[in-house]
UniProtKB/Swiss-Prot annotation:
UniProt entry keywords in alphabetical sequence: Coiled coil, Cytoplasm, Cytoskeleton, Metal-binding, Repeat, Zinc, Zinc-finger
PROSITE patterns xref list: B302_SPRY (PS50188), COS (PS51262), FN3 (PS50853), ZF_BBOX (PS50119), ZF_RING_1 (PS00518)
Recorded family membership: Belongs to the TRIM/RBCC family.
Organism: Homo sapiens
Main subcellular localisation: cytoplasm
SMART domains associated with the record: BBC (SM00502), BBOX (SM00336), FN3 (SM00060), RING (SM00184), SPRY (SM00449)
Localization per record: Cytoplasm; Cytoplasm, Cytoskeleton
Zinc finger (RING-type): 7-42
Fibronectin type-III domain location: 513-607
Name used for this protein in its record: Tripartite motif-containing protein 67
Pfam family, one: SPRY
Lineage: superkingdom: Eukaryota
Amino acid sequence: MEEELKCPVCGSLFREPIILPCSHNVCLPCARTIAVQTPDGEQHLPQPLLLSRGSGLQAGAAAAASLEHDAAAGPACGGAGGSAAGGLGGGAGGGGDHADKLSLYSETDSGYGSYTPSLKSPNGVRVLPMVPAPPGSSAAAARGAACSSLSSSSSSITCPQCHRSASLDHRGLRGFQRNRLLEAIVQRYQQGRGAVPGTSAAAAVAICQLCDRTPPEPAATLCEQCDVLYCSACQLKCHPSRGPFAKHRLVQPPPPPPPPAEAASGPTGTAQGAPSGGGGCKSPGGAGAGATGGSTARKFPTCPEHEMENYSMYCVSCRTPVCYLCLEEGRHAKHEVKPLGAMWKQHKAQLSQALNGVSDKAKEAKEFLVQLKNILQQIQENGLDYEACLVAQCDALVDALTRQKAKLLTKVTKEREHKLKMVWDQINHCTLKLRQSTGLMEYCLEVIKENDPSGFLQISDALIKRVQVSQEQWVKGALEPKVSAEFDLTLDSEPLLQAIHQLDFIQMKCRVPPVPLLQLEKCCTRNNSVTLAWRMPPFTHSPVDGYILELDDGAGGQFREVYVGKETLCTIDGLHFNSTYNARVKAFNSSGVGPYSKTVVLQTSDVAWFTFDPNSGHRDIILSNDNQTATCSSYDDRVVLGTAAFSKGVHYWELHVDRYDNHPDPAFGVARASVVKDMMLGKDDKAWAMYVDNNRSWFMHCNSHTNRTEGGVCKGATVGVLLDLNKHTLTFFINGQQQGPTAFSHVDGVFMPALSLNRNVQVTLHTGLEVPTNLGRPKLSGN
């Protein structure tokens, strides 16, 4: 877990961590060193002086802190805001950094962008030296000049991990929220490791927060307005008692923090500097959390924009805790908000659920490591077995095989070393992933233990995403050995003595699978579906990864793949009726695809057998008699479809009227699967139908009524539907006699039998019928 608690800039445990807009964390002192100015601000600054590494960092940190206080004071800086980059130079000139400046200039207008590291900025972090003061000028004058130059400039900070840059507003680095949970976890982690003997006295003394000495000097004063601890030298350099600091009150450092037991019982890392009334500044977190401990810690975290208000709600749009003033008068006024406690519990539950997945993967990884170690032992044992066998065979041919024996032993050893290397590489890789996942899991568990809802919600989204990414890295093949413990080597000792010098290992290479055998006794057809079964021939030693089943189009066309997988039984539905299909299958493995099997010919049913489909019918439709009888519970017309779909061939089915009350208008015909089901069939463009009462009938499509024909239905009548997709026509019959002319021509596509009726009608479906040859002539239509 320690890697989760280290700053990506300094590599040490986090000190006063702040949360960047990209959800990554960085120490506040480190943030001051990596903050940069945009080109608008850089053009007002003098050419920076090249400093040594130590003096540059020291002066940069001191100037940044000093200018942060000056900016907060207000009058001296002319409203330059709290830019933490105020004491930093404009960056060294040159081709590499010039591209970086252009990148920042084009993206930080939006407050968020990306940053591409140049040759002069390794790891994506630019640490700029401070602007030197003009010769002979005082420190205050230098700060005043720097502040005046910053009044018309803006600054940005680049994340050292994802290289995204974010603009700093008038508050500077104080505008970023402090990660109180991470700070508390770091403190608890340090206490858990235990203090080194002889360092307890030093740890009990408050230290200067601006010293870059190792170790830092003890703090001599604490500014109540800035909430920063200073040693004597840093106080004179960074916080002189003149200018905007003249009204600041310097006091003695607070007492040391309580023992670990007391610190664990109270809130940690939440202290903020006390607000002042006269333009005083307050760094985010300041020294209160790190030095004063429980003596100045607040019980509840406060809103950075309304410092006297506690967090009470959670803004869903901005994903941040807010106070009630933010909702009434701030930028969150019209945003969606939810109770803080509810969102805290919800995000904790999400993180816990994600952790369960990572925990399962970690458990599998541990078991996998055990398996790999067993493979190591098996490889050793199998290698020894092969060596012993080889020695025995070579001893039988002492005179002729002496020199050849050494060569063969070398090959076995190389094979063994290769396998061992592969397994060790996989162990190291898996161990690294496991350690990363375990560290992340321990860190997340520590986060869950915290009882700070707002702090938790500040980092929960990022943690959930990281946990999900960590879970996704354990892909399917990651927990499978890359090599086998078996040695695919065989020594053939049969050849004659004259062939001894050609004696070598026969390595069994993976070959393509042989031809699969179709199991014709298990292959069958039912209605418009076919089932095929196959198996591999006996004594097949080649591995099989899967099979490919191919089927033609039922008209002698080209084959196409209809199934790819490991099963040896497959059923294909939705084929054409009265059609002949050819099928074949082949196997494949890592070496390639094997040859095709013999082709099997399958004939689908000559006629269609189907029922009403309970899944596609309207909810008011009532089906019975094994889904062959339909009625309705509503007085309105409702639609039900059949289970078959037709796109070619000639099909005929009949519907027997079991009940007919109060002269309703049932409709019979065909429709697309997307037909509207809460009105009469034929009123939309997805259905072609004939609706009929007790006296006459009409054809209807797109709500267009045509071909009124005398003759209706009653109880006991039979309505026939003839769909001829070879001629693309639809014809209707009543009691064996054609009703009117051909109802519709030029019908093309996929159609399903359809029916609409209300509660006054009940019909029974009869399918599997041959097309009648003795149908009567059509009745003349009335129009």
